[in-house]
Every structure is written in structure tokens, then in C-alpha cells.
Design a protein with these regions (language model features):
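Conserved P-loop/Walker A NTP-binding site and adjacent catalytic elements of P-loop NTPases
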Residues: 36, 46-165
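Helicase-associated low-complexity/disordered flanking segments
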Residues: 8-49, 62, 129-133
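Targeting/processing segments of secretory and organellar proteins
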Residues: 2-3
């Protein structure tokens, strides 16, 4: 669905139906303090897109976000996942399996996505350590058709928790 520049389309899916939603303006970050602390230190708070997305994902509901470039869509998707990994890691440790799969249409975009994951992962890790909590060891990787066999084998033996692929 194409949307005019500057217009936000946000939809909730219940499996069959799609309905536009509105945010009532009242929002608190639904994240672990290490996650919300990184976001607040780095950006001062969420964008409108992120606030609306996180209000939905905090309820474990599916969402489709269409918004202009630079509005925070990628972080809106990934920070919820990072938060869940942090909480699970602290509670019981992270299983050696892929928890988050991001499928990209382009190899170059896959590499950009992974690069953009490094800052929040490092920031959350630092936040955990500053709180006296252990690093939960979230691993991420990119796998494309160009990924060498040795690296693929490493991923098989110790799967990344976040896998970006084409």
C-alpha cells in the first residue's frame, strides 16, 4: 500500500482483518530498563512510529508499519525483539537458536541492517553491565549466498539469535 510522504499508516492484524489504529498520546516504554535506557540516552525517546509500534508489540500483536524513510521503522521492529531476548536471557539464558529472522530483498540492505543492529546491541549490553546484570550474549549474523562455507558452519554450530538474510 502506497502512502503519501509524511503520512503514517499503522495497521493491526488479527489474522484476517486489518484496521488502522491511533495512539492516544499516552505512552511508556514497555522495555527492560537497559533497553529503554539506551533508547533514551541515544535518541531522547521514541519517534511517533516507534511509540505506536511498541504500544502494539507490547501486547504481542502483529503490526504493519508504512512510514517515511528515517522515521524509525527498523528500530521499531528490532528493539521489541532485542527486549524480548534480554528478558529471556536474564530469566533463563538464550537457547542456541535463531529467535529473530529478518529477510531482506537485497544483500546490501542485509549488511546495513546488521550494521544498524550493532549500536543498540552494544548500548543494551553496556546498560546491563552498568546495572550489575550479566551480558545475555545476543548474537547476530548475516547470511547470504556469498557467505563462506566456514562461516555457515559456525552459524550451524552456534546459531545467531538474530539472523539477517536474503
Amino acid at each position: 500500500m502506497a502512502t503519501p510522504q509524511g503520512w503514517l499508516f499503522f495497521a493491526l492484524f488479527d489474522g484476517r482483518n486489518c484496521a488502522e489504529i491511533e495512539n492516544d498520546g499516552m505512552f511508556q516504554l514497555p522495555f527492560h530498563p537497559a533497553v529503554s535506557g539506551w533508547l533514551e540516552r541515544r535518541f531522547g525517546g521514541p519517534t511517533e512510529v516507534q511509540a505506536q509500534a511498541w504500544a502494539v508489540t507490547a501486547q504481542r500483536r502483529h503490526a504493519l508499519i508504512a512510514a517515511p524513510t528515517g522515521s524509525g521503522k527498523t528500530l521499531a521492529a528490532f528493539l521489541s525483539a532485542i527486549d524480548e531476548l534480554v528478558r529471556e536471557g536474564l530469566a533463563q539464558g538464550l537457547a542456541d537458536e535463531v529467535h529473530v529472522l529478518y529477510v531482506s530483498p537485497l544483500k546490501a540492505l542485509s549488511n546495513d541492517i546488521r550494521k544498524n543492529l550493532q549500536e543498540p546491541l552494544a548500548g543494551v549490553r553496556a546498560g546491563l553491565l552498568a546495572m550489575g546484570l550479566p551480558d545475555v550474549g545476543i548474537r547476530d549474523a548475516v547470511r547470504t549466498g556469498d557467505t563462506p562455507a566456514a562461516e555457515r558452519e559456525r552459524m550451524r554450530r552456534a546459531p545467531p539469535h538474530i539472523l539477517v538474510t536474503t
